[in-house]
């Protein structure tokens, strides 16, 4: 039975890879600061926008530059600042009500991936007012253009400012919906390093490792292209060169800027080449317990990479060379092991734990099933795994396991 399922998965993935050149992928127009949004407002004829964010961004004053440019250009705006770390269906519906009440014609998401994912799902609800978030989950379910979406990342990690994905949690079902459609790619991305200066060290670490996960999974998968391989390698190099500095010195402009570039490149890479089991397991943990996505990815990543074994040695070796943690003369296996060891070392240096708390044994089978359904057949992983194999990761990362 597994052989037949595996064959179907590989045929499905090959089909997507062959179709990639003709799929309507686009990248957002990149802007270097909020002050430059004036030309966007004029080009898009925006008169009233909904700003989607969270209370932390508001309390830190990070929306001030945005408010200034909106007021200076006579653009009315309403503020939705109740987005949760793992945005929920309720967040999307609350934001939709505010969008409609204020007769908005555009969206600005400022914050981390949560705000951007919430805004993307909101855009989908505007485009499809009769469909629920759950009805739009999956691949290519959204075909209509969403309202103009401007993404302003204040973290360097999620890559949501360039991706076609939005992850929304349904607390009642304790499950995450993955919406993956080309119209969800933001139309504009503001990459301003100054907006990331106040990001706390722990979030700098976990979002940075999130970006690393994107680059790694995009590179080691079986649906890569010359472009996505190049972008992933460049992202890995930038992250290994800059994330520790950004963690230790939040106002180091160059490291913050390089991390934004790395997150963007990793975002483009995984949008076209997809992710893998690291993300699938992390999403199941987030849906079940609200585990922060970047933290889950960082903790899970070494275990999954080790489990891929020989199927990923060559590509992990190439990433190891790019990261500067092994020599080209090292063998594939040695290089791969050095890369995984370097990831563990990065986690330790930045205070990321080896284990996660709160995982219940009785939940593991359901989470593994959800992860398997998310990953197969879509994610072109180096080696296909069964639900039983995926269950092992939850045991490995649980703080009650040895």
Which functions belong to the PLM regions below?
Residues 90-193:
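Glycine/threonine-rich beta-strand-loop-alpha-helix active-site module
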Residues 273-338, 344:
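C-terminal catalytic subdomain
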Residues 2-9, 316, 326-402:
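C-terminal charged capping/lid subdomain of soluble metabolic enzymes
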Residues 165-273, 388:
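Carboxylate- and glycine-rich phosphate/diphosphate-binding segment that chelates Mg2+/Mn2+
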Residues 58-130, 245-256:
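N-terminal small/polar loop signature for handling phosphorylated ligands or for N-terminal nucleophile
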Residues 1-79, 400-402:
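An N-terminal, well-structured beta->alpha segment
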Residues 48-54, 78-81, 107-110, 150, ...:
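Short glycine-rich or small-residue beta-strand-to-loop segments that form or flank ligand, phosphate
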């Amino acid at each position: 039975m597994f052989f037949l399922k595996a064959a179907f998965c590989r045929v499905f993935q090959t089909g997507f890879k062959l179709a990639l050149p003709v799929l309507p992928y686009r990248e957002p127009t990149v802007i270097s600061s909020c002050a430059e949004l004036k030309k966007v407002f004029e080009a898009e004829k925006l008169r009233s926008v909904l700003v989607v964010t969270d209370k932390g961004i508001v309390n830190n004053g990070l929306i001030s530059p945005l408010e200034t440019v909106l007021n200076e250009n006579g653009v009315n705006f309403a503020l939705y600042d109740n987005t949760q770390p793992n945005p929920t269906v309720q967040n999307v519906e609350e934001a939709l009500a505010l969008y409609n009440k204020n007769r908005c014609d555009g969206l600005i998401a400022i914050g981390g991936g949560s705000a951007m994912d919430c805004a993307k799902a909101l855009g989908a609800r505007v485009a499809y007012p009769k469909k629920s978030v759950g009805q739009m989950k999956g691949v290519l379910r959204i075909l209509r253009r969403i309202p103009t979406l401007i993404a302003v990342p204040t973290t360097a990690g999620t890559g949501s400012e360039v991706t076609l994905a939005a992850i929304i949690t349904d607390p009642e079902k304790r499950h995450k919906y993955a919406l993956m459609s080309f119209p969800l790619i933001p139309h504009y991305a503001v990459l301003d390093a100054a907006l990331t200066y106040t990001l706390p060290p722990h979030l700098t670490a976990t979002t940075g490792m999130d970006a690393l996960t994107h680059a790694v999974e995009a590179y080691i998968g079986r649906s890569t292209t010359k472009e996505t391989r190049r972008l992933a390698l460049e992202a890995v190099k930038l992250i290994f060169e800059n994330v520790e500095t950004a963690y230790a010195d939040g106002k180091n402009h160059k490291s913050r800027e390089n991390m934004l570039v790395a997150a963007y490149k990793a975002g483009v890479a995984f949008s076209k080449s997809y992710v893998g089991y690291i993300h699938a397991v992390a999403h199941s943990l987030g849906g079940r317990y609200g585990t922060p996505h970047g933290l889950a990815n960082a903790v899970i990543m070494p275990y999954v990479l080790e489990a891929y074994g020989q199927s990923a040695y060559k590509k992990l070796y190439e990433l190891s060379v790019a990261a500067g943690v092994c020599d080209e003369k090292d063998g594939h296996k040695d290089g791969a092991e050095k890369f995984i060891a370097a990831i563990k070392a990065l986690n330790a240096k930045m205070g990321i734990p080896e284990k996660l708390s709160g995982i219940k044994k009785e939940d593991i089978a359901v989470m593994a099933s959800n992860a398997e359904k998310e990953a197969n057949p879509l994610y072109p992983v180096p080696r296909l795994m069964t639900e039983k194999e995926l269950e092992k990761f939850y045991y490995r990362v649980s703080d009650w396991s040895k």
